[in-house]
Amino acid sequence: MLIETYDLEVFTPPCHPETDRLSAIARPGVDLREALPYLNAILPGAVYNAAAAALLWKKDSHNVAFHADRIAVGNVPDREAAIEELENLIELVNRTWERRAEIEPSHESR
């Protein structure tokens, strides 16, 4: 398991203080950089930037950003939904990492 614990922050996006939607960030305390090419290989429509150690992805109506030091999700309706979404994303990272021997990593920027 790559991510065992994380710190969570749920907030109103500063660029949209009038919105009723929230953003959330999980900071796992481990470097996710090596997992990004594997996520890039399996997530349809992901946009990977190896130099920035970032992978952007749209999941339903949520914008998701995987960085070396954090996972961020936007456009969630409330705190509970933000926590659930981040837990699902962390599980995705962990499952992908555990299966990395079966996945051909993609370093392609799209």
Describe every region a protein language model picked out:
Residues 70-104:
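Ampiphathic alpha-helical segments that act as solvent-exposed interaction surfaces
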Residues 34-41, 66-68, 84-91:
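Extended Gly/Ser/Thr-rich low-complexity repeat segments
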Residues 1-49:
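Short Lys/Arg-enriched alpha/beta "domain-start" segment
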Residues 54-58, 96-110:
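Short proline/glycine- and acidic-rich turn/helix-capping motifs at secondary-structure junctions
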Residues 50-51, 90:
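Intrinsically disordered, low-complexity regions enriched in Ser/Pro/Gly/Gln/His and often acidic
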Residues 2-9, 51-55, 61-62, 68, ...:
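Long, contiguous binding/interaction regions
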